Amino acid sequence: MAVTEAENPLLGEITCGTLLQKLQEIWDEVGESDEERDKLLLQIEEECLNVYKKKVELAAKSRAELLQTLSDATVELSNLTTALGEKSYIDIPDKTSGTIKEQLSAIAPALEQLWQQKEERVRAFSDVQSQIQKICEEIAGGLNNGPHVVDETDLSLKRLDDFQRKLQELQKEKSDRLQKVLEFVSTVHDLCAVLRLDFLSTVTEVHPSLDEANGVQTKSISNETLARLAKTVLTLKEDKMQRLKKLQELATQLTDLWNLMDTSDEERELFDHVTSNISASVHEVTASGALALDLIEQAEVEVDRLDQLKSSRMKEIAFKKQSELEEIYARAHIEIKPEVVRERIMSLIDAGNTEPTELLADMDSQIAKAKEEAFSRKEILDRVEKWMSACEEESWLEDYNRDQNRYSASRGAHLNLKRAEKARILVSKITAMVDTLIAKTRAWEEENSMSFEYDGVPLLAMLDEYTMLRQEREDEKRRLKEQKKQQEQPHTDQESAFGSKPSPARPVSAKKPVGTRVNGGGLNETPMRRLSMNSNQNGSKSKRDSLNKIASPSNIVANTKDDAASPVSRADPVMASP
């Protein structure tokens, strides 16, 4: 029973005293000696001391660790506040009294808060620095300098603001560079469109990221890319300038050849894309394909083709202009020698010593001068036409007056009667017409310092001959009238003495058609020659008839050419050989 209680000492309340009491009871039962008991008690005491000693050592060690932890926490707190630079924003206890654990408990919340801030600040620094490093690598051309390291000794907001300002500057620089790259790419695109070049291959040769399929933010903005883009743009602009210069030269040649060869508008429209830029500046040429090589080659082929046709076409155009010049002279009744002029034009073109443009320009100048001269002669020529028309009417009137049947009731007689009335009025103005024409002609000759010729004959000579013939006609009429009076005077006296006798029937002359002038003997004989021939053949009666039929101005023109002793010839409008 005692053994069982000894083996279960923990059944009751266990203390050192109860244990010692139990030990005494056991020794009493066993019969241990006092020496043995003292020895055992001493051993127990030593073992208790060792236990206490170990506990003290453990407690001391724990205290030291707590002190070290407190010290480390204090240092960490100091370092964090220094690194973050935000001591004023953290509730940090200043007192050093109280137990170690109390001090640790007081520091722990501030330390935890600073650790959180540090982690957030490190992430912010890491994010900013990574963006800065990325942009710097893009500007440097994609050089990777390795992962960035955040300096945790200085995590202050001031330093973070500095990094953020630097990031903003780099972002602005990146934006500016990207904008510049896009401008370069757009310029390259426009130039390639005008020159009809492959835009994609052109920009990808500079950098693969410049392909339009790639996003804007992925395009290279490095110094090398910008430099190569600038060089590409410069090369394309020089190419554009050279092509435009070549195209304008071809356009000028085409225009000259067209003007030279009088090319139709339909043929010219085929090369509007060439001539439309003949005076354009480089920046004004923006149409797609306007300076393509194939268009320039087409223009070159057309210029070569026109050059080959130029000689034959030149002769055709020159003769056409010569015909125009001859027509102007013909309308102005100016006599030239067209055969000689055409031969000289042919020889000049075949020799090739004269530029076609100069030749045609000279002919155009002659045409302009001919038109001016024709215009200056117009008033006189109009008066000449009126004079000739009046003379024709006078000739018709004389034929009409000699017609014995003019008052008959034949068909159209009333029309001839009206015409005769108008003709008499017109004939009465002929003298004034001639006088005015002479005055106008003399004034023209004084103004132009040259003789006024009509179909190669001086007009004043024609008018003088006409005036002379008209005066002879008037004199002849007066002479015949006086002669007739003298012949009729004896008959009048005889009739008054013995009475009148019926005269034999007057022979009826052959009926002549009225309205057509009859100049028996031909229109091309000179009045003086015709008068001379008629006088020799028919005597005074023929001479009288010739004077009554005054020569028309057209006959005077033809005959004055033959009879003029010193005709005034007009210089042929022939281009001077260079």
Swiss-Prot record:
Keywords: Cell cycle, Cell division, Coiled coil, Cytoplasm, Cytoskeleton, Microtubule, Mitosis, Nucleus, Phosphoprotein
Phosphoserine found at: 503, 532, 566, 569, 577
Region (Disordered): 473-578
Biological processes annotated in GO: cell division; cytokinesis by cell plate formation; microtubule cytoskeleton organization; post-embryonic root development
Biased composition (Basic and acidic residues): 473-494
Top-level taxon in the UniProt lineage: Eukaryota
Entries under Pfam families matching the protein: MAP65_ASE1 (PF03999)
Subcellular location: Nucleus; Cytoplasm; Cytoplasm, Cytoskeleton, Spindle pole; Cytoplasm, Cytoskeleton, Phragmoplast
UniProt GO cellular component terms: cortical microtubule; cytosol; microtubule; mitotic spindle; mitotic spindle midzone; nucleus; phragmoplast; preprophase band
Biased composition (Polar residues): 549-558
Similarity remark: Belongs to the MAP65/ASE1 family.
Binding partners and assembly: Forms a dimer. Binds to microtubules (MT). Bundles polymerized MT via the formation of 25-nm crossbridges with centrally located endocytic MT.
Protein's UniProt name: 65-kDa microtubule-associated protein 2
Annotated organism of origin: Arabidopsis thaliana (Mouse-ear cress)
Record lineage: Eukaryota, Viridiplantae, Streptophyta, Embryophyta, Tracheophyta
